[in-house]
Amino acid sequence: MLAQLKKHLTLHELWEDAKFFFLLNLGLVATAVGIAVFKTPNHFAFGGTSGLSIVLATLFPRWNVGAFMWFINAALVVLGFAFLGIRSMGWTIYSSFALSFYVSLCERVCPLSAPLTSDAFLELCFAVILSAVGAAIVFNIGASTGGTDIVAMILNKYTSMPVGRALMVSDLGIVLVGAYLYGPATGLYCILGMILKSTVADSAIESINLRKVCTVVTSNPQPVSYTHLTLPTILRV
């Protein structure tokens, strides 16, 4: 049994698994920094579990954003187990709790009671870029950041409701509550952040997956065919 396991776990597969785990955590850390350093101090509640946690932390100041993310993500994971099963959840379970851990760690290492600067738009840009790029890294490797993605998976399995529309409605609801709590200016920043995040995330994913294609016209195709077959192997070495 052990010999068969060693046979299947080749060095290349171990490297791919290590790279996947590193990129997953890199994306989650970037997202967590965007939440803890830029979104939370400015009350940028533009959707998702982080936005809901920011609102709840304002209503119940005894708990911080990281604590509420733990509670919400734990509840969503339980829902995922009940409606989807453990196989369908996959890395979503890890991502949900790892993101909560990284946010709590950022709040412990760098506690902020006020924004870093007086420029709200500058902070919005960093909040959007870090969150969007982090999400793009995670989505590009076939994982997710957890949270409301679990709700999307449940809706996709049991209803005919378009997932994107359902999540947009829930995010808009969080934004409206944020606008009521923090004022119209913050509410408008939240709406802008919600729009920019999806745009930046799509652009980041396209940039990561960018490929160059060339067409070779030749009367001697054999050397070109040989190069086409051997070049990917050479690049992997």
Please report, for each region that a protein language model flagged, where it lies by residue.
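Core subunits and conserved enzymes of cellular information-processing
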Residues: 2-221
